[in-house]
């Protein structure tokens, strides 16, 4: 959430619309949530009573909510409350979608795969745009891909590409670094390798290289990965990443019309 907030501050027109909520216990913030249209609502860790109240607040003004993402118990509390708000949006049903693993790393074991890392530039922009769209389509989150300013959006991303034997073979991005009570954190993502270049270790090589860049700054690296993709999770484990949490995706289904 923090990296998205930084992006919105820097580029207010990056999303169609955006909302942030915080849950407080007195003067203490005990939870937060955000939504950047047209994407899902992200729920952070928070008391279950707070997530139930949030559901009521969201239902009042957001009948186009496509789904939610967050810790399982927080999502469950939100969904139970949302189903009883009586709003148009709440009459949609929800179904469990993808489960993501939250992974962090303390000690990097660099990949031995040959190649070089290069930052996004005019010379590789076309490839980065193509691969960004392909990645979004694969994770079923391609709502931005047809935006008129999509190329400009890609230009603003902190992307790196892996080149082997003169050919671009994989890509990884870095989100904005966020300051937390536990220190600075930078998220790795997206990570994408075209199908024809997979199973050669290029994804692990580029992920390891950008992780090293993060660690050189003194920040801690983290990433989200699809729990249903054993190949990528094996790669991350080999690099030294460890699973510390999970988040669930719940998709909303519009009611049938007569």
Residue ranges and their predicted role:
Residues 1, 108-142:
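Short amphipathic alpha-helix that is part of the acyltransferase structural core
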Residues 25-31, 35-114, 250:
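Acyl-donor-binding surface of acyltransferase catalytic domains
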Residues 48-57, 190-195, 199-216, 233-238:
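Conserved acetyl-CoA-binding loop-helix of GNAT-fold acetyltransferases
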Residues 69-75, 222-233, 237, 250-257:
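Conserved beta-strand-loop-alpha-helix junction that forms the acyl-donor binding cleft
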């Amino acid at each position: 959430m923090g990296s998205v907030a930084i992006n919105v501050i820097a580029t207010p027109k990056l999303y169609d619309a955006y909302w942030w909520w915080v849950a407080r216990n007195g003067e203490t913030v005990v939870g937060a949530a955000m939504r950047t249209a047209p994407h899902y609502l992200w729920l952070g860790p928070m008391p279950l009573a707070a997530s139930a109240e949030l559901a009521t607040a969201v239902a009042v003004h957001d009948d186009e909510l496509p789904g939610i993402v967050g810790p399982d118990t927080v999502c469950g509390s939100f969904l139970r409350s949302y189903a009883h708000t009586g709003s148009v949006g709440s009459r949609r049903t929800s179904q469990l979608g993808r489960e993501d693993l939250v992974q962090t790393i303390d000690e990097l074991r660099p990949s031995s795969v040959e190649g070089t890392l290069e930052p996004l530039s005019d010379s590789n922009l076309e490839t980065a745009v193509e691969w960004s769209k392909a990645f979004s389509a694969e994770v079923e989150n391609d709502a931005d891909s047809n935006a008129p300013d999509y190329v400009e959006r890609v230009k603003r991303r902190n992307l790196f590409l892996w080149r082997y034997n003169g050919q671009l073979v994989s890509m990884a991005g870095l989100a904005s670094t966020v300051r937390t009570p536990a220190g600075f954190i930078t998220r790795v993502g997206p990570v994408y390798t075209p199908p024809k270049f997979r199973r050669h270790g290029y994804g692990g090589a580029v992920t390891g290289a950008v992780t090293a860049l993060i660690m050189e700054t003194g920040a801690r690296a983290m990433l989200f990965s699809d729990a249903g993709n054993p190949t990528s999770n094996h790669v991350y484990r080999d690099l030294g990443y460890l699973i510390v949490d999970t988040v669930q995706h719940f998709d909303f289904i519009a009611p049938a019309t007569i």
